[in-house]
Amino acid sequence: MFSLNKNNKTKNILSLILYCFLVISLFAHFFYCIGKVPPSHYVSKNNILSAVSASANIFNINSNTTLNENISVYEEKLTKFISSAFNERNNSFLNGSVYKLYNYYGTSDANAKYSLDYEFKRIAYLRDWSLERSIIFTSINSLVIINKVTKNNNKIIVNLDEYYNFNYIHNKQFASNKFSFTIPHILTLYSYTNDLGEECFIIDKDYYSDVFNDELNDYNFYLTETSLPYTKKINPNYKVSEQFNKNDIIRFDKSLFTDHKAIISGYDSNGYPLIDSNSFNISNMPFDLGWKEKNIKLSY
C-alpha cells in the first residue's frame, strides 16, 4: 500500500513539472514572436480609438445633418405661421379689425379662447391708450426667433422670442418716433391636415409676460367680435407727466412689490418721457405704456 502511494505522488510531481515547463515554453515562444515583429506593424491604442471616434463622428455627422435639416424645415413652417399670426394681430392694433385672428386660434378649446381673449384685450388697450394721447401708430412689426421646438404627435411646444418694433407720430406732427421691446413666449400649437393634404397649425396656448398686463382688466369680450371699437376719446388737453427727468430711475409697482425698474432715457418729439429697461429689452418706450401712472414711482 505504501509503495502504491509513493508511485502516485511521484507521477503527480512529474505531471506538475511537465505542465509548468509547457506553460513557460508557450510564453517564451509568444514573446519571441512579438520581438520579431517590426515596430511599423504595431497598431497603437490611440490609433484604434481615433478610428472608432472617426467612425462615430461620421455617423453623427450624417444623422445630425439629416435631423437638423428636418428640424430646420419644420421650424421654417412654424416661423411662417407664427409670424403671420403675430403680424395679423399687429394689424389689428392699427385698424381694430380682429375677424382674421379667429383663423389662428382653436376657439373650441378653453385655452385657446383665453389666449385669443387676452389678445383682444391688448389690442383694445393699446388703441385706447394711443387715442387718449393723440398718438397714431404708423407701423407695428414682429420678428419671431424660435429657440426650441418640442413635438409629441400633433402637439407642438415652441419656445420663442418676439421682437416688437413700433413706429408712431403725434397728431398734427410729422416727426416719427419708434420704440421696441422683446417678449419671450411658450407657445403650444396643434398640427392637422387640411382637405388638400397640407399640414396646418392652430394655436392652443400662448404663455408670456407682458408689458401691458397692468391695464387689461377693464376689458371684456365674448369672442364674437369682428372689430374692437375705441372706448376712449382723444384728449387734446392730455397732460404729459413732468415729475420725471432724464436719467431718473423709476419703479413699476404691482400690489406691494416692485415688478421691474427702468431709466428715463429721453423724450419723444412731443416731450413724452421714454424709458429703457433690461426687462423685456425695452428701448425708448413711452414710460406709462401698459401701466397705471399711480403705480409708477421714482426709485430712490
Task: Give a label for each model feature.
Residues 5-22:
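N-terminal Sec-pathway targeting helices
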Residues 28-46:
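Sec-dependent signal peptide cleavage junction
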Residues 48-140, 234-236:
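Core segments of small alpha/beta cavity-forming domains
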Residues 124-176:
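Surface-exposed, charged secondary-structure patches
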Residues 146-159, 188-200, 266-271:
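A short, structured loop/turn motif at beta-sheet edges
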Residues 170-239:
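Low-complexity, intrinsically disordered terminal/linker segments enriched in charged
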Residues 243-245:
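Short, well-ordered loop/turn sites that connect or cap secondary structure elements
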